[in-house]
Amino acid sequence: MTETCPNPTIETYADTELACLAGAKAALYRWAATVATRDVDQVLALYAPDAILVPTLSNQVRDCDDSRRNYFDNFLANDGLVCDIQVFKKRVSRKLGTVVVGGLYTFVYRQAGVQQVVPARFLFTFERIDDQWLITGHHSSIEA
């Protein structure tokens, strides 16, 4: 069941907005740290069951657990994978309790013994579902 941020009065909106932003920020950094573990199950647990993933290194839109698993099985297999978040901006939807976070990150990994550096931009949507912040949308593309 999807839970939104509480529908606050004008006086409490700022506090509620800050709490929502803090939850989404923590979820974003948890995602980056979990990617570095290269544990597919742990990464997938950060996504809502109906989340949409438009991944960095694939042209296929992933909209179910099996398709997201297929992508992360391949992506997380890269040796030494880390994700460094450089910049992000965020906003809270006043109606839906959804937090949108967009920014820039860099993936670094080794492929065939050669270090690969992939600067990318991202857009995540997070929602509080069953008392945890989950990814409901994730778009990532290589920087132009």
Residue positions per predicted region:
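Short, low-complexity N-terminal intrinsically disordered segments enriched in polar/charged residues
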Residues: 1-49
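Short beta-strand edge/turn micro-motifs at domain boundaries
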Residues: 2-7, 119-144
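Residue-level signal for well-ordered, solvent-exposed loop/turn and beta-edge residues enriched
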Residues: 52, 114, 132-134
